[in-house]
C-alpha cells in the first residue's frame, strides 16, 4: 500500500496529477482544491495517498493533508457516496467548512458539490453528524497549533471550542475566538478561562 508520494510534478490533468518519483510516474486522482494548490511541472510535490485496489484496477487518490484523506474515507462510508462524489465534495468545501455544514445540518452547503443531490446531501449530514466532530476537532487543533505553536494543550482547547459551538457559534468563529484567547491566557489555560475569554472576543 502507498501512503505518501514525494517527488516532482510531471503533469497536471483535469482531475489528476502525474508525480515522478525517481523516474517512476504515479497517477494520483485529486480534488480540484488539491490540484489548485500544487505547483507547476518539475516542482516538488508531496501527497498523502489513499490506495484503491479492485479486481480490474488500482487507483491512487492524492491529498494535501492527512485530514483531507480521512474525510475522503469518511464521506464514502455513506451510502451512495463513492470516490468521485467524495472528491467533488472536497473540491467544493474545505474540511472545516464540511465540518460546519454537518454540525449545522446544512444540506444546501453540501449539495453545492457536483453529483450531490438532495437525498445524498441529507444522508451525509444526518449519518455523519455524530461521527464528524472528531475530525472537526482535529482540524481545529491543527489550525490552532499552526497559529499558536506546538505547546497548545489539546483538551482545554477542544473543550472550549465545543462549548462555544454549543452556544450557537460556528466552528470557525469558535476556533478564532479560542486562538485569540490562548494568546491572552497562555498555553496552560484551562477550558473555563478559554471559554470566558473567547466569549469576550466574540462579543466585540
Swiss-Prot record:
Extract the ranges annotated as region (Domain II): 65-143
Q: Name one GO cellular component term.
A: Holliday junction helicase complex
Where would you find this protein in the cell? Answer: Cytoplasm
Question: What does the UniProt keyword field contain?
Answer: Cytoplasm, DNA damage, DNA recombination, DNA repair, DNA-binding
* Chief localization: cytoplasm
Purpose of the protein: The RuvA-RuvB-RuvC complex processes Holliday junction (HJ) DNA during genetic recombination and DNA repair, while the RuvA-RuvB complex plays an important role in the rescue of blocked DNA replication forks via replication fork reversal (RFR). RuvA specifically binds to HJ cruciform DNA, conferring on it an open structure. The RuvB hexamer acts as an ATP-dependent pump, pulling dsDNA into and through the RuvAB complex. HJ branch migration allows RuvC to scan DNA until it finds its consensus sequence, where it cleaves and resolves the cruciform DNA.
Its subunit composition reads: Homotetramer. Forms an RuvA(8)-RuvB(12)-Holliday junction (HJ) complex. HJ DNA is sandwiched between 2 RuvA tetramers; dsDNA enters through RuvA and exits via RuvB. An RuvB hexamer assembles on each DNA strand where it exits the tetramer. Each RuvB hexamer is contacted by two RuvA subunits (via domain III) on 2 adjacent RuvB subunits; this complex drives branch migration. In the full resolvosome a probable DNA-RuvA(4)-RuvB(12)-RuvC(2) complex forms which resolves the HJ.
Protein name per Swiss-Prot or TrEMBL: Holliday junction branch migration complex subunit RuvA
Amino acid at each position: 500500500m502507498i501512503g505518501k508520494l514525494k517527488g516532482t510534478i510531471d503533469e497536471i490533468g483535469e482531475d489528476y496529477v502525474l508525480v515522478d518519483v525517481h523516474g517512476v510516474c504515479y497517477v494520483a486522482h485529486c480534488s480540484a482544491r488539491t490540484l489548485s494548490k500544487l505547483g507547476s511541472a518539475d516542482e516538488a510535490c508531496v501527497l498523502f495517498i489513499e490506495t484503491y485496489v479492485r479486481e480490474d484496477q488500482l487507483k491512487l487518490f492524492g491529498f494535501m493533508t492527512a485530514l483531507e484523506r480521512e474525510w475522503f474515507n469518511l464521506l464514502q462510508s455513506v451510502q451512495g457516496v463513492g470516490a468521485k462524489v467524495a472528491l467533488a465534495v472536497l473540491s467544493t468545501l474545505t474540511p472545516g467548512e464540511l465540518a460546519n455544514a454537518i454540525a449545522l445540518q446544512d444540506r444546501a452547503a453540501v449539495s453545492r458539490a457536483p453529483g450531490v443531490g438532495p437525498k445524498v446531501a441529507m444522508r451525509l449530514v444526518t449519518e455523519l453528524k455524530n461521527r464528524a466532530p472528531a475530525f472537526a476537532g482535529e482540524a481545529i487543533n491543527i489550525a490552532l497549533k499552526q497559529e499558536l505553536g506546538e505547546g497548545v494543550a489539546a483538551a482545554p482547547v477542544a473543550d472550549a471550542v465545543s462549548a462555544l459551538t454549543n452556544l450557537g457559534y460556528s466552528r470557525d468563529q469558535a476556533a478564532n475566538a479560542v486562538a485569540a484567547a490562548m494568546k491572552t491566557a497562555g498555553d496552560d489555560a484551562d477550558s473555563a478561562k478559554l471559554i470566558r475569554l473567547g466569549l469576550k472576543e466574540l462579543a466585540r
